[in-house]
Regions:
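Accessory nucleic-acid engagement/destabilization modules that flank
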Residues: 2-209
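Conserved helicase motor
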Residues: 9-12, 303-316, 470-473, 488-508, ...
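C-terminal helicase lobe and adjacent C-terminal extensions/tails of nucleic-acid helicase motors
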Residues: 105, 388, 453-462, 468, ...
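Walker A/P-loop
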Residues: 241-263
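Conserved Walker A/P-loop ATP-binding site and its immediately adjacent core
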Residues: 272-296, 305-308, 404
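Inter-Walker segment of RecA-like/P-loop motor cores
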Residues: 297-346
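SF2 helicase catalytic motif II
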Residues: 338-342, 352-390
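Interdomain hinge/linker at the junction between the two RecA-like core domains of SF2 helicases
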Residues: 401-460
Length: 735
């Protein structure tokens, strides 16, 4: 190695030779990646400059000494001076582009390892680093002879709420470029694995063949004729400009495949690169991903959520490829959660933000869109508008219960105005009248409060019946009162995921066997969406209209009867609905009156307007304050505050299957990604009050820091899961 070579990365190969990547090579590599990524939204030169500047601090003597010592290249070398390298590029950016670049270049460069900072911290950070450098702005070794490239202004006009997404998107381009160029040098095998992937143009014929096969092998029954009509309308409407679209199809109308064919053809027509399907429940994700893999092959579908089992893919190379793809979403088809999608859009962490630039120029399907959090609805909808306007993203909202996301809703009491999307184009015209053609259920509503025993007696009159309630306690109480003739099942999140999945599969198998005459199930809301089951009769505890119609979607799903009934009931006063969202939703439904066509889209619109008028805010954590002033972007603070699922509980490992063996493996070998994934299948989430109660009972122990285990078999019931009688049971299950 020549003395003047400035090292960016180095490693020792199997033959003991040192392989070096110079800082010039790395900076050029990052610049080329970032230029390409930012070019997708017209900001290629911004990406290139970020790449060129981000590691200028590595030119200092102190950093060169540091990297040689830490790598073992010169283990005895003395390190003197400030080894922090990220801030140097930020100082140069300020010299070249002045204060106007504070939010769009300085922050990205100084934060490319640590995470984006709040605006008011940036100058303080740089000044602190200058002081560490003996009050010199830059180490004398750093070459600042860099051409000041004129950066073009964005071709799009930006409003106040757009700037934070623009800033974060530039950051995404830089950090993913940095990760990828480093990987190409340090781990060429992984980098090579990433490269083999198909385009949507390659995959579209596979979907078209699947649709032809389905049509050829299906009869001409009414339901199949309707599904074909929906698909043909989606194909017709796919030849449209990038924008906002909705697909409102009742249960049984073939929404999954129809939305997919629209998205694929729309993307190919508009030159969009990938399809991202965001879903609120992991149970729906698993089903949807399975359908997609059967069409496109498992090598073309990325399933990204916390419950994915990495070992479900047997091919080790494909397993590694999918794992790598979760890092930056460079894949043609992605199925993920709403939480993963939206919390990434508001994150400040490099490992999370690196995927954002791959949302650019894509089609996003938001499934069961009515489940979007009301508490964050305004910043979420504003982010959708920004991604459409700045980043060429088309959005498709799919559900049987379409919420109101367009227009302005104000004049409510309390005064909580909601500013929606200017225009959302519905794919299915009114004259299709799908809610009439696909009607297989009627609602019978009784608002008089019933006792547990009265509801149990009503359920016992039916041989096959599903009852959905709002709380874990209600599920437990009703289940324990039901007669145990035939098959009687309980479903709630007091069962660990492995137990829950096993019970749902047992239920599906039982329903397919006509010899199982009696099947009675009591469940919390977890079964309302994404669990493909069919009962002749459904009971649903009072709730919002969207939840009731979701429950009705489990009733006569296959149309085996002319018309079935979903009964809506209330429990007596001592079992009132939990205050908050559930009570608001039920109140909005009750305010519609009783003489309603409950399944009509107009009724759903009226319901959501009633519901919105009961909300004090659609921006619970005040994202507007943190993010809507371009001169003061609190990106770090906003990321901490934007939590769609507030993690107020404690996870405990319960005694089920081989969970205790996994705990022992962890204690002996320490934690690993694969082991923690396996162990997560045996965890139940409880709140702090009940966690403390279990501790006082002496049944929970901390086996390792942060790992709490209940290893008493008698504490975990094979039918209802973790046994505990406390206030946690009254908490509404949202997921």
């Amino acid at each position: 190695m020549e003395k003047q070579t400035i090292i960016s990365h180095l490693y020792q190969n199997s033959e003991g030779c040192w392989i070096i990547q110079s800082n010039e090579e790395h900076s050029n590599g990052v610049a080329n990646f970032a230029l390409q990524f930012a070019g997708e939204f017209g900001m290629s030169e911004w990406g290139r400059v970020l790449g060129q500047l981000h590691d200028k601090g590595k030119e200092s003597n102190a950093f060169q000494q540091y990297i040689k010592k830490e790598s073992g290249y010169e283990p005895n070398i003395k390190v003197s001076g400030n080894t922090h390298h990220a801030y140097v590029g930020g100082i140069i950016a300020r010299k070249l582009y002045g204060k106007s670049s504070d939010n769009f270049m300085i922050n990205q460069i100084i934060s490319h390892h640590s995470g984006l900072h709040d605006s008011d911290e940036i100058d303080a950070i740089i000044n602190r680093e200058i002081e560490k450098n003996l009050n010199k702005e830059l180490p004398v070794e750093v070459d600042i002879n860099i051409d000041r490239v004129k950066l073009n202004r964005p071709s799009f006009s930006m409003q106040a709420n757009d700037f934070h997404h623009f800033s974060r998107m530039l950051y995404s381009c830089l950090v993913d470029a940095d990760f990828l160029d480093t990987e190409s040098f340090m781990d060429a095998k992984s980098f090579e694995i990433r490269q083999s992937k198909k385009t949507l143009e390659d995959l579209l014929p596979l979907l078209e063949d699947k649709l032809k096969d389905l049509k050829a092998n299906s009869d001409n029954s009414g339901i199949n004729v309707i599904r074909n009509q929906v698909q043909q309308q989606c194909i017709k409407m796919a030849d449209s400009a990038k924008g906002f679209y909705s697909l409102t199809v009742p249960t049984g109308g073939g929404k999954t495949l129809s939305s997919l064919v629209w998205a694929m053809k729309h993307a190919v027509k508009n030159g969009q690169k990938r399809i991202i399907i965001a879903i609120p429940y992991t149970s729906i994700i698993v089903q949807t991903a399975s359908v997609l893999r059967s069409i496109f092959g498992e090598e073309n579908v990325l399933e990204h959520h916390s419950n994915v089992d990495p070992e479900s893919v047997k091919d080790e190379i494909l397993q590694e490829k999918l794992k790598l793809a979760t890092e930056n979403w460079d894949y043609p088809i992605i199925v993920t959660t709403n939480v993963q999608l939206f919390e990434s859009m508001f994150s400040n962490k490099p490992s999370v933000c690196r995927k954002l630039h791959n949302i650019v120029n894509s089609v996003v399907i938001l499934d069961e869109v009515q489940t979007l959090s009301m508490a964050y609805l305004q910043p979420i909808v504003d982010s959708l508008k920004t991604y459409n306007k700045l980043f060429n993203v088309s959005f498709l909202f799919t559900t049987a219960s379409q919420p109101v996301l367009s227009g302005l809703i104000d004049g409510c009491t309390p005064k909580a105005a909601f500013s929606g999307i200017d225009h959302v184009s519905e794919i299915i015209p009114d004259d299709f009248k799908l809610h009439d053609k696909l009607r297989r259920v009627q609602l019978s509503i009784n608002n008089y409060g019933k006792t547990y025993d009265e509801i149990t007696n009503m359920l016992s009159e039916h041989k096959r019946v599903l009852c959905i309630v709002n709380t874990r306690r209600d599920a437990k109480e009703l289940y324990e009162r039901l007669p145990k003739d035939g098959i009687t099942l309980h479903l709630s999140k007091m069962m660990c995921p492995a137990h829950l999945s096993e019970t749902i599969e047992k239920l599906k198998t039982a329903l397919k066997d006509d010899r199982n005459e009696i099947i009675r199930v009591v469940s919390t809301q977890l079964i309302e969406a994404g669990v493909d089951i069919d009962f002749p009769v459904v009971f649903r505890q009072e709730a919002g209209l969207d939840s009731i119609l979701q429950a009705a979607g489990r009733c006569n799903r296959e149309g085996k009867q002319m018309l079935s009934t979903t009964y809506v009931f209330s429990l007596s006063k001592e079992h009132n609905l939990p205050k908050g969202d559930m009570q608001d939703a039920n109140s909005a439904r009750l305010n519609l009156g009783s003489a309603q066509d409950w399944f009509a889209p107009d009724t759903m619109t009226s319901y959501f307007r009633q519901l919105y008028c009961r909300k004090e805010s659609f921006d619970k954590k005040d994202m507007k304050h943190y993010l809507y002033n371009p001169k003061e972007l609190y990106l770090e603070t906003a990321a901490k505050e934007f939590q769609l699922i507030e993690d107020n509980g404690m996870n405990v490992v319960v005694c089920w299957e081989n969970s205790m063996e996994l705990v022992q493996q962890l204690l002996v070998n320490g934690p690993s990604y694969m082991l923690m994934k396996k162990l997560s299948k045996y965890m139940v989430n409880i709140n702090m009050a009940d966690f403390k109660a279990l501790q006082e009972m002496g049944v929970v122990s901390e086996k390792k820091e942060g790992l709490f285990v209940i290893d008493y078999k008698q504490q975990y019931d094979k039918y209802i899961g973790l046994r505990i009688d406390n206030n946690w049971a009254d908490e509404v299950l949202i997921q």
